[in-house]
């Protein structure tokens, strides 16, 4: 057992690059908070705006204690030179860090049952490049307090939705696992069962596919509460609206969600509510 007041831990520089979309990055931030609290040190988090998520952290959440958010601006996809320069700068900055861990490296530690702190305890510099939850549990999501504008929009929607409701998250887009394992028919079947239990139940629907919303509204009817939104993740408005959806899901009685979706998982943990994942048995 090692001691937290050991200089190698107190003086350690830890940089975490948060990858992926909103749900993924929230998991990474929660892990960074847990690590920061355990080591009693500041963790630097790289927040790179890109096609997966283009929105300032501070337009989504309030400032965090002991987490230093370092943002990089969005670069348009056609600007190959700028993208190459960014990759080169990242490589040059972190290639000589004592320990460098990506998703595969973190999975290897986990499968080998090696504790992350034990692995890094003698390092002076650590670079973690991931879209995954890598340390502690996800309870540290509670430290992610929505920015004022996000909170106000969510408050209005909660008032308009009125009363108890069930959250429904249908993930489509580029998530092939969700599309393959969480068919629309299974969602419809489950929602109809809920209606039989309670004819007055409402469903708050969050989805990145307007076609899915159209189908559910046609089949399930007025019980569906749905706010059409900007779906492009490369637009800040799209990410802000996604966070509002996540907050509404987290305030539901429970979530009926998609398989292999970090958004579904994070919404459930964020609200500490039950999650029922739609997964076909075929």
List each model region and its residues:
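Nucleotide-activated donor-dependent transferases that construct or modify glycoconjugates
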Residues: 6-20
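A donor-sugar binding/catalytic signature common to diverse glycosyltransferases
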Residues: 20-21, 26, 30, 242-282
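Catalytic donor nucleotide-activated moiety binding site of glycosyltransferases and closely related
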Residues: 169-173, 192, 198-236
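A short, glycine/small-residue-rich beta-strand->loop->alpha-helix junction that serves as a flexible
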Residues: 18-27, 175-181
């Amino acid at each position: 057992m090692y001691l937290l007041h050991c200089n190698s831990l107190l003086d350690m520089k830890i940089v975490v690059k948060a990858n992926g979309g909103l749900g993924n990055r929230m998991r990474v931030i929660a892990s960074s908070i847990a690590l920061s609290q355990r080591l009693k040190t500041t963790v630097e988090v790289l927040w790179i705006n890109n096609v997966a998520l283009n929105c300032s952290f501070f337009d989504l959440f309030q400032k965090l204690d002991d987490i230093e958010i370092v943002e990089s601006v969005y670069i348009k996809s056609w600007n190959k030179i700028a993208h190459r320069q960014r990759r080169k700068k990242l490589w040059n900055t972190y290639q000589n860090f004592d320990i460098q861990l990506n998703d595969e490296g973190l999975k290897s530690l986990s499968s080998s049952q090696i504790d992350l702190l034990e692995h890094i305890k003698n390092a002076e510099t650590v670079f973690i490049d991931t879209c995954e939850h890598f340390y502690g549990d996800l309870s540290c999501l509670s430290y992610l307090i929505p920015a004022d504008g996000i909170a106000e929009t969510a408050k209005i929607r909660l008032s308009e939705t009125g009363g108890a409701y069930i959250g429904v998250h249908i993930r489509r887009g580029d998530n092939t696992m969700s599309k393959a394992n969480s068919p629309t028919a299974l969602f419809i079947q489950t929602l109809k069962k809920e209606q039989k239990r309670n004819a007055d139940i409402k469903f708050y629907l969050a989805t990145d596919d307007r076609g899915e919303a159209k189908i559910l509204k046609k089949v399930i009817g007025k019980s569906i509460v749905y706010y059409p939104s900007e779906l492009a993740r490369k637009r800040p408005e799209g990410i802000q609206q996604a966070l509002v959806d996540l907050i509404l899901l987290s305030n539901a009685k429970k979530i009926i969600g998609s398989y292999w979706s970090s958004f579904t998982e994070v919404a459930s943990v964020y609200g500490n509510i039950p999650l029922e994942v739609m997964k076909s048995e075929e």
